Regions:
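Active-site-adjacent substrate-binding region
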Residues: 198-225
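Loop/turn elements at helix/coil->beta-strand transitions in domains of secreted/extracellular proteins
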Residues: 110-113, 145-149, 175-177, 220, ...
Length: 275
């Protein structure tokens, strides 16, 4: 993460935090807007946003990307796509790029500076996707780009751990479960990678986001998962993998989680910056 001065941004960040803390009330005031193929998502009203706007150079910065770019959701009448294989598609209207687009919009509405990398990392083979997404990250950082947060946005695979439930309901909206994943880089045998993430710091961020998510929409976030893989999280502190729903969710349910994630990050960032 970049270090930043606190003084001139305090009022703006407090405004962000106040807006995000009011997540439930703000969500009830959000207006539905139409997106292609009649999938409804929610967008904050302009007059609900913080009045103290951050200057571009002061905005907290986020990089969004998708190592498993073609992951997709359950097809519905309003979300029909041509699959590359089951629950996967090249169609950017229905794969993880659509979720990243929506999350980027929600974050920008809350004052974040967002870069959304839309590179497809799966071709020519899924097994090399993390190597290719790492090359993108290293190239950006070597070019001098800096980010407060680097999020790899995925969707989970449905399993019995979900106990048949995929969503929480809030104000008539079905919101897909979210899960934060932290990589230790130790590897399955303990030998691991030469370069490993500062995973305790990433875990601290993941837990703070999980708590903020569940405060905004009770039960929406599952417990943080810590795994032995690296998931490219060694490139920076503030690097996490975010699972937005699973393959049994609909795209609409995944999109409904994006405003909640954005609100949670605004709250967490304000609290961390003003400490």
């Amino acid at each position: 993460m970049r270090s930043r001065g606190k003084g001139k941004r305090a009022a703006a960040l407090l405004a962000l935090a106040a807006f995000a803390c009011a997540g439930g009330a703000a969500a009830r005031q959000m207006q539905a807007r139409r997106v292609p193929l009649t999938i409804e998502v929610v967008a904050p009203q302009a007059d609900a946003l913080p009045a103290a706007a951050l200057q571009d150079e002061e905005k907290p910065s986020v990089l969004l990307y998708h190592t498993h770019t073609w992951e997709a959701y359950e097809m519905t009448e309003d979300a029909q796509y041509v699959p590359t294989e089951t629950w996967r598609t090249r169609d950017e209207r229905f794969n993880m790029l659509r979720v990243g687009e929506e999350l980027a919009r929600c974050l920008r509405d809350l004052g974040f500076s967002v870069v959304h990398d839309t590179t497809a990392f799966e071709p020519p083979n899924l097994s090399g996707a993390y190597t290719r997404s790492l090359a993108m990250l290293e190239a950006r950082l070597a070019a001098g780009e800096t980010y407060d947060y680097i999020f790899d946005i995925h969707r989970d695979a449905y399993s019995g751990l979900y106990n048949g439930a995929n969503c929480v309901e809030q104000d008539g909206r079905r919101i897909a479960y979210v899960m934060l994943l932290v990589g230790k880089g130790t590897g399955a045998t303990g030998s691991g990678f030469d370069e490993r993430p500062d995973w305790p710091r990433n875990l601290e961020l993941a837990q703070a986001l999980t708590d903020a998510l569940n405060a905004a929409a009770p039960g929406v976030s599952r417990e943080v998962k810590v795994k032995s893989g690296r998931f490219n999280q060694h490139v920076s502190t503030g690097a996490l993998l975010i699972e937005v729903g699973n393959n049994r969710n609909t795209l609409a349910e995944a999109l409904a989680a994006c405003p909640v994630i954005a609100q949670a990050l605004a709250q967490v960032h304000a609290a961390r910056t003003l400490q």
